[in-house]
Swiss-Prot record:
SUPFAM superfamilies: YacF-like. InterPro entries: ZapD, ZapD_C, ZapD_sf. Keywords: Cell cycle, Cell division, Cytoplasm, Septation. Belongs to the ZapD family. It comes from Ralstonia pickettii (strain 12J). This is Cell division protein ZapD. NCBIfam families: PRK05287.1-4. The keyword Heme does not apply. Cell division factor that enhances FtsZ-ring assembly. Directly interacts with FtsZ and promotes bundling of FtsZ protofilaments, with a reduction in FtsZ GTPase activity. One of its GO terms (cellular component) is cell division site. It holds the Pfam family ZapD. It comes from the Bacteria. The keyword Cytoplasm applies.
Amino acid sequence: MILYEYPFNERIRTLLRLEDLFERLDFFLVQEHPLQHHVALTTLFEVVDVAGRADLKSDLLKELDRQRQTLTALRANPQIDQDALDAVISELETASGNLTATHGKAGQLIADNEWLTSIRSRAIIPGGTCEFDLPAYFAWQHHPAERRRADIIKWAQPLVPLRDATMIVLRLLRESGQSGKVIANAGSYQQMLSGRVYQLMQVRLDESALGFIPEISANKYMLWVRFTQQDGDLRPKPVDADIPFQLKLCNF
């Protein structure tokens, strides 16, 4: 299955972007080539840019606390697996405590490092990190992979609490919805939301439908999924076939 996700608000959009960046950072960090570690470092800069939103930390702390309170109230429910419930509550408390203990803006360690700041400012310029622009960075790229990796891990370490909080919030959000099979008649599907508030929509397609691309939009009254199809280098065109897919609406 191929999964498309659509956030209903800016907060979830920011968390999804952070998740994507952290996954990219993980992928390139374990590689060996200097160019791959260059991508890891520039991805770390992107994480800092996205995480620099002033109210992100407070939003995450509020959400972690709200989830903890909601789940704590379920301890009296005999139909709930109490061991699994306790494990999630403990995870929420740990994530909240670690995030609370962080000081300053996200990525402050990078902002305070003049050398990293110089790389960051040049990295936004096409071809701006050549050896004649940043000879010290060029030399760093020739260190053994283990040393480069250790450096990037050290610089990313202060962002781990933010990452952990982001991951658990998104995980619980995704687990909150129920998936159902629907059909986009003539390539189009719409559904009234009837006043219900959602934060995330998931569209899953079979691998056999890989050529169909969903274009998703929504407001507080209705959601739309329109399928298009790419034909070589041409602009995607609307599809007029009936397309089955899995739809999941998620809200805490």
